[in-house]
């Protein structure tokens, strides 16, 4: 009864008002699975291709009708008759149909929408929640959230170079407690910013985006907010950064325009990070070096890799082949997992497994352009990832994922696990 009878895609809007893809997969039993595809603002060079129409007369060229047609006219007829429970077979069929390394024929957005909708339909068919269908009976660990409460870089129109300043409520005893702690710090930060006369408008991911005097002032106001909320920085709450340094890299140098000395070599940028790590309880730095600066990545890993989680996002783009290269060269110690960087659920699970076998931590992540789809919340629990990055404590597109995790925690009840600080198992 899990035989696929129809596959249908439509164009919808994401949280930034840009078109994206939604796919529905129908089974012989009458069951339907639906999934929507996210979209990034800062993207890695080697990400799978997000197919856009390029028609300036519609959505400023960002329409996805080509991807929609690829699902409805090409992919659908290939999958009708296949069993939805054959996730690997279905994903392989789509990869063969596309025939390119970066999914440039059909579009990774088209392929991913189908891949996720198939998994949702199959889970519904067998009567299991999505996280349990994907992960099995041992899928029960709720992730420590990495909450983006202050935005800069490509995620905000302000003068802060670093893209994301995040809090991690690592002292919490449960996911629900971590969420509450994060929300309280978020509201305290709004009060702190207002008190200093700063704008409290929010960026793409729900974090505040004020024009601060420096990158370090962002850390200072967050530290003040943590104290104002009644918590201890370094014990209850840890800090994390996403530098998105590929956006700052030009001609072999890094340019942080709002620093006293904007132009920095790789060594000078690592000095900058080391100084921040010594002054503030920073436990994680994402994309601290540019995606093509592998020498810089090796240097930062050698210097900070025992003290700080060094997350490769643009560096690895959820690609098992690139991740294996990084592991062999000893760069980074963690990988950010974004479903649409690679384009199928099967390949995503392969990347997670590869990382775990090498002792790399895994962080399941949203994109700046999100929808109400909550698949990544289920994925985080399915693979016992330990960490999730899904934005701030406002905007429904972000909060939807947190609320889904609350439901999962409630459903798991006493079997639910939450490791807090222990998710950083490879730091000593």
From Swiss-Prot:
* Compartment(s) of residence: Cytoplasm; Secreted; Cell surface
Residue positions of the active site:
205 (proton donor), 338 (proton acceptor)
Q: Which residues form a coiled coil?
A: none
Question: What does the record's cofactor remark say about binding?
Answer: Binds a second Mg(2+) ion via substrate during catalysis.
Which pathway does this chain act in? Carbohydrate degradation; glycolysis; pyruvate from D-glyceraldehyde 3-phosphate: step 4/5
Gene3D superfamilies tied to this protein = Enolase-like C-terminal domain, Enolase-like, N-terminal domain
**Keywords for this entry?**
Cytoplasm, Glycolysis, Lyase, Magnesium, Metal-binding, Secreted
GO MF term list: magnesium ion binding; phosphopyruvate hydratase activity
Q: What class of enzyme is it?
A: lyase
Spell out the family assignment given in the record's similarity comment: Belongs to the enolase family.
**Function of the protein:** Catalyzes the reversible conversion of 2-phosphoglycerate (2-PG) into phosphoenolpyruvate (PEP). It is essential for the degradation of carbohydrates via glycolysis.
The protein's name is: Enolase
């Amino acid at each position: 009864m899990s035989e696929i009878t129809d596959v249908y895609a439509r164009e919808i809007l994401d949280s930034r008002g840009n078109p994206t893809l939604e796919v529905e997969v129908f089974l012989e039993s009458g069951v339907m699975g639906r999934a929507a595809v996210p979209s990034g603002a800062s993207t890695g060079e080697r990400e799978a291709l997000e197919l856009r129409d390029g028609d300036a007369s519609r959505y400023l060229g960002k329409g996805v009708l080509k991807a929609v047609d690829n699902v409805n006219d090409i992919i659908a007829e290939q999958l009708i008759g296949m069993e939805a429970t054959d996730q690997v077979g279905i994903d392989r069929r789509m990869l063969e149909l596309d025939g390119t390394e970066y999914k440039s024929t059909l579009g990774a957005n088209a392929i991913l929408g189908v891949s996720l909708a198939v998994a949702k339909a199959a889970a519904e068919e067998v009567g299991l929640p999505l996280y349990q269908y994907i992960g099995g009976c041992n899928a029960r660990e709720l992730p420590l959230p990495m909450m983006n409460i202050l935005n800069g870089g490509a995620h905000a129109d302000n003068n802060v170079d670093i893209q994301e300043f995040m809090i991690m409520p690592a002292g919490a005893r449960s996911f629900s407690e971590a969420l509450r702690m994060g929300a309280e710090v978020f509201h305290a930060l709004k009060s702190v910013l207002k008190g200093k006369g700063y704008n409290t408008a929010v960026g793409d991911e729900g974090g505040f985006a004020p024009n601060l005097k420096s990158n370090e002032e962002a850390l200072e106001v967050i530290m003040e907010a943590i104290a104002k909320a009644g918590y201890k920085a370094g014990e209850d709450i840890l800090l994390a950064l996403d530098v998105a340094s590929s956006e700052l890299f030009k001609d072999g140098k890094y340019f942080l325009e709002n620093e006293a000395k904007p132009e920095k070599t790789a060594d000078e940028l690592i000095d900058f990070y080391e100084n921040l790590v010594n002054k503030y309880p920073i436990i994680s730095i994402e994309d601290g070096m540019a995606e093509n600066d592998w020498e810089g990545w090796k240097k930062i890993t050698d210097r900070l890799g025992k003290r700080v989680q060094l997350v490769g996002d643009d560096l690895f783009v959820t690609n098992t082949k690139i991740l294996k290269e990084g592991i062999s060269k000893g760069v980074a110690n963690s990988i950010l997992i974004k479903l649409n960087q690679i384009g199928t659920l099967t390949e995503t699970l392969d990347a997670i497994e590869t990382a775990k076998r090498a002792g790399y931590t895994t962080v399941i992540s949203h994109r700046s352009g999100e929808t109400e789809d909550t698949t990544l919340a289920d994925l985080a629990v399915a693979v016992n990832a330990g960490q999730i990055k899904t934005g701030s404590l406002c905007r429904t597109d972000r909060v939807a994922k947190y609320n889904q995790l609350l439901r999962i925690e409630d459903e798991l009840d006493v079997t639910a696990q939450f490791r807090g600080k222990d998710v950083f198992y490879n730091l000593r």
